[in-house]
């Protein structure tokens, strides 16, 4: 997790840890807890308070190549699992590859499968990197699962798109369409709720254009949804075109995605000529195109020396002969 405390690797050992309990009702993901969990090994147990009730958790370790079969994300977790791509997890994957998972997830066992309340991003990162997935498993009811899920989302907030889906569900199922009542319950303004709900109406293929869904703000999502009212098929087609460009290696900034999507609403293409785009030819080798200009960016630590020398040789041919 991007802002979660990191468990130093050197604190790990294989000595059993006796059951303990936290006397304070604070959320379990605190510094003192991280230090205690860091020394746990498979099968060790710890007792923690969740929603004011003590829960005994046992550390289980799932193999990365089977984590998606032996676990699932709890249905009450609002994070959209389909949007957890390598780009969206770029804050986790490097550390998983280097040192493995640092902070255990939380979940419960249901019919032989572990349901994850907190740790869906780490679960996907473990699957993508085929790393071990560490989960503290306890007997949890839905209230406790919801509390742990919210705790995890405090470290890596869900997007306006994901929150909008939850708001829309609550608005219909719990508040009979009364936005004011929902706003009071969520302790946020009606405007924010309305913007998030409108953002959630966008096709998922549009949200997937961004590196991670959090790049699309509620304000921008709301404006985009309103701009394409009764024009959803046009929006989907443009999103499909941009996805094809991404597959070819083009990298878009968040602002560029929105500009390119809305450009199809204009009859003239003149406004598109000055847009910039970035193409990645290989790891460490990208080119930025902007109007008539092209900017080459090479990472000498990742691009072979012979390739850089060839590029330099071509550039030297452009040098004007000395007078």
Curated annotation (Swiss-Prot):
Record Gene3D superfamilies: 1.10.10.2830, 6.10.140.1550
- Please report a single Pfam family linked to this protein: SoPB_HTH
Report the domain of life of the source organism.
Bacteria
- Tell me the DNA-binding residue spans: 180-199
Reply yes or no: does the keyword rRNA processing apply: no
InterPro entries the record matches: ParB/RepB/Spo0J (IPR004437), ParB/Sulfiredoxin_dom (IPR003115), ParB/Sulfiredoxin_sf (IPR036086), SoPB_HTH (IPR040873)
Tell me which family the UniProt entry assigns to this protein: Belongs to the ParB family.
Remaining remarks: Overproduction of SopB protein causes IncG incompatibility.
The identity of this protein, by name, is Protein SopB
**Organism for this UniProt entry:** Escherichia coli (strain K12)
Q: Which gene encodes it?
A: sopB
